[in-house]
């Protein structure tokens, strides 16, 4: 049946109600619902809607409004029961805001934002006005959900139904089987015990008879076998001990001693060849000093085993070896002593040559005289001085040749002054005189003397350098005289210009 709609006024809100009328029994129509039932439904709904509208207004005027949440699970319906009708009320949120169209008559009214759905059904055990009979309790106990009789009589065979049937069969079997199984077990256990008793008695008798017949023979055989083994072991052990004792006393010990002597003699000969007789003597002396008790014990033991002739031969051979080593070592020791004495003398000569030579005043004076003679020779040798000055001193401009006799006199005076200044510079410089004695007095070969002569010539050249400056200073008055003569002055310090 199609739902009927009506409006309920609660304060300033108009609440829209959707009424659904449920059918009664097998009847598809809703003839049982009358206008009296409608008035009763309106009064019941108004009493339920007033607290709902009041709650909505209070929540609206609050400062902090809670956001509406979408409830996925539907709330339980509100059940109301009247005299002739039963109601189930559902409140559903409307997502569209509705307004009143006619504002003149309904200016103050507002549409409630929730929709109300009401399901009406007749109450149980109540007489309907249309002459329908009351329903029996027995008929109401069965479910009338399925309208067709075939569906109710033959329900669908689902998986749950099949499972239930299987479980019922299993339960029936378990109820019947336990007593039978107990009886079978008891009978089987009784038979098994009887069989075991018979078998046990028979096996015990058989074992007793067998042991009575077999044990005496086995005991005799075991005793005979063990006694034979024990006697054989005794005989083998006795013969083995006797043989070991005889061989040890008679044969084994002498052979071991001979082998030890041969190995020791081979080692001694190898030591002689490698390290010489001196090392062997040191070893023999150490052994005799460090091992006296052991050697005495060994000699006593060997003397008890060997005859006296063999011990005497061994002592003689040892003495002969010591004498040979003493004869061999003497020439070697003499040669070593001579070689060491020669090395010591050479070392003493080298040390004496390296010692510093004392310097005396007479040696210094002799060196000064030698330098004076060498400087005079240098003044006579014009070419040597000029070449040396050209190589060591600054380059000077060549003077023009003069034909007058004044130049020859000037050169003679210059040479004399050079010789005097060299002697004075040598006497004033004590360092040059002190450095020379080491080279003169030291015992070195001719090569060192040639090197000393070269050093002396270099020292002489160094002593000539200041003389050139002195001669240039002393020759100033001669240059003034030449100016007075009218000749132009030529500067010696200027260099030739490159053309």
From Swiss-Prot:
Amino acid composition bias (Basic and acidic residues), ranges on this chain: 478-490
Bias (Low complexity) ranges: 421-432
Disulfide bonds: none
Annotated spans, Disordered: 142-203, 250-276, 288-341, 375-499
Biased composition (Polar residues): 142-162, 179-194, 250-268, 441-456
Pfam hit, one: UPF0492
Superkingdom of origin: Eukaryota
Similarity annotation: Belongs to the SLX4IP family.
Name assigned to this protein: Protein SLX4IP
Gene source species: Danio rerio
